[in-house]
């Protein structure tokens, strides 16, 4: 499969320091990497398919530092999820656990096309989205193991990661329920006029939920800056899209709402689509992005992932479309990094993950009294009365 067509230029780089915890780890020795103004123009591996709108350009502007950040961050995400699998099998992680390996390009590309003013809300496959928003490995593993240093203080677990200070409004365990909440965030953004948008992520398994269409309708009616992102990994639990949807072209599901189908295994295509969608949403209201992606693990830890699909199918996607390998090829073909440097990066990532796991194991368990905290939000002192204002009087939470 042809990866892309490449060209170099020397103009001001539009790549910002998107992944602060990771980008500092790279030192570049070749001529292209020593030029801070160097840019690359890369054509996406596949064209965008549009519904009720003109598609964005396939030519994406990037930089050596951004590509290196993509590689390292996706490698970190991949290793983080594989290690979580081992921890689950060792009974150090309990309950539900949904892994994201294979889909890393969506989380990384979305970060590259947004700012921390923008909001992201997603379903239960949320570990990598949290990490992309600036979360740390310690917070991830401590939460997965139910420890006090977790991002939700050990009380949320795998499905309920959260980082409000970076605009990440969490993973949510109820299928599709996060989409109306995301549209509510977009309502707040429009009310405050802060020129930001909300990305509400859901899977193909949630695409048939009624509340999704209700939220989309009100968002379109009020021109809210809401971007609905369907992460189509082709299987809702063990059900293939063709078995659950009469029309699996999810980017067209909005009818009167524009949509765009994106190669969700290409981080640069995701970046381009998210920038395009943000510009559209701020001017014209909601838009749907369908990310064509793939998960390597089963739906959850109880799913071997091979009863409803063949191992040949999984290995075929790995060979042809793996998001990390795509970026690796770009880095090597442009002489931005050597194979040894990339392998060294992967070794560093493995070490970081191991160190974070060790620290998370040392984190204390929540105090039993914490069971009763965060049950209700702090009251605003609002009072409710009965019909005659004497019958019933209560202070609302």
From Swiss-Prot:
Enzyme Commission code(s) on record: 1.2.4.1
Keyword Oxidoreductase on entry: yes
Catalysed reactions listed for this entry: N(6)-[(R)-lipoyl]-L-lysyl-[protein] + pyruvate + H(+) = N(6)-[(R)-S(8)-acetyldihydrolipoyl]-L-lysyl-[protein] + CO2
Binding residues annotated for pyruvate, in chain numbering: 98, 124-125, 173, 175, 204-206, 233, 235
Keywords: Magnesium, Metal-binding, Mitochondrion, Oxidoreductase, Phosphoprotein, Pyruvate, Thiamine pyrophosphate, Transit peptide
Gene3D superfamilies per record: 3.40.50.970
Chain residues that bind thiamine diphosphate: 124-125, 173, 175, 204-206, 233, 299
Keyword Metal-binding: yes
Subcellular localization(s) per the UniProt record: Mitochondrion matrix
Top-rank lineage group of the source organism: Eukaryota
CC per GO annotation: mitochondrial matrix
Required cofactor(s): thiamine diphosphate; Mg(2+)
Protein activity control: E1 activity is regulated by phosphorylation (inactivation) and dephosphorylation (activation) of the alpha subunit.
Residues that bind Mg(2+): 204, 233, 235
Biological process terms in GO annotation: pyruvate decarboxylation to acetyl-CoA
Biological function: The pyruvate dehydrogenase complex catalyzes the overall conversion of pyruvate to acetyl-CoA and CO(2). It contains multiple copies of three enzymatic components: pyruvate dehydrogenase (E1), dihydrolipoamide acetyltransferase (E2) and lipoamide dehydrogenase (E3).
NCBIfam families reported for this sequence: PDH_E1_alph_y
Subunit-level organization: Tetramer of 2 alpha and 2 beta subunits.
Protein name: Pyruvate dehydrogenase E1 component subunit alpha, mitochondrial
Organism of origin: Pisum sativum
């Amino acid at each position: 499969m042809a990866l892309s067509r490449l060209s170099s230029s020397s103009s001001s780089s539009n790549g910002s320091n998107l992944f602060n915890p990771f980008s500092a780890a790279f030192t570049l020795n070749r001529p292209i990497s020593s030029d801070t103004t160097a840019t690359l123009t890369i054509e996406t591996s596949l064209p965008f398919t549009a519904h009720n709108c003109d598609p964005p350009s396939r030519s994406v502007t990037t930089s050596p530092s951004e590509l290196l950040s993509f590689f390292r961050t996706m490698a970190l995400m991949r290793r983080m999820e594989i290690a979580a699998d081992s921890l689950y099998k060792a009974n150090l992680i309990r309950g539900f656990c949904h892994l994201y390996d294979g889909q890393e390009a969506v989380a990384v590309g979305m970060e590259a096309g947004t700012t921390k003013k923008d909001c992201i809300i997603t379903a239960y496959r949320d570990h990598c989205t949290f990490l992309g928003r600036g979360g740390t490995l310690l917070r991830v593993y401590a939460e997965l193991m139910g420890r006090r240093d977790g991002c939700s203080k050990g009380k949320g677990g795998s499905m309920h990661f959260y980082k409000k200070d970076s605009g990440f409004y969490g993973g949510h365990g109820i299928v599709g329920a996060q989409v109306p909440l995301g549209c509510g965030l977009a309502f707040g953004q429009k009310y405050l006029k802060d020129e930001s948008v909300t990305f509400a992520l859901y899977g193909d398994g949630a695409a048939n939920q009624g509340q999704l269409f209700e939220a989309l309708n009100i968002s379109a009616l009020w021109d809210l800056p809401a971007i609905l992102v369907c992460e189509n990994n082709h299987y809702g639990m063990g059900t293939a899209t063709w078995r659950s949807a009469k029309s699996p072209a999810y980017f067209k599901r909005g009818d009167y709402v524009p949509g765009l189908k994106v190669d969700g295994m290409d981080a640069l295509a995701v970046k381009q689509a998210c920038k395009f969608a943000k510009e559209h949403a701020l001017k014209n209201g909601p838009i749907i992005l369908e990310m064509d992606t793939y998960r390597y693990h089963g739906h959850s830890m109880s799913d071997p992932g091979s009863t409803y699909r063949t191992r040949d199918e999984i290995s075929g996607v790995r060979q042809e479309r793996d998001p990390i390998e795509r970026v690796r090829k770009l880095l090597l073909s442009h002489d931005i990094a050597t194979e040894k440097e990339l392998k060294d990066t992967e070794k560093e990532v493995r070490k970081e993950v191991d160190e974070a796991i060790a620290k998370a194991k040392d984190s204390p368990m929540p105090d039993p009294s914490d069971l009763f905290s965060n049950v209700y939000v702090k009251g605003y002192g609002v009072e409710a009365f009965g019909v005659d204002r004497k019958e019933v009087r209560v202070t609302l939470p």
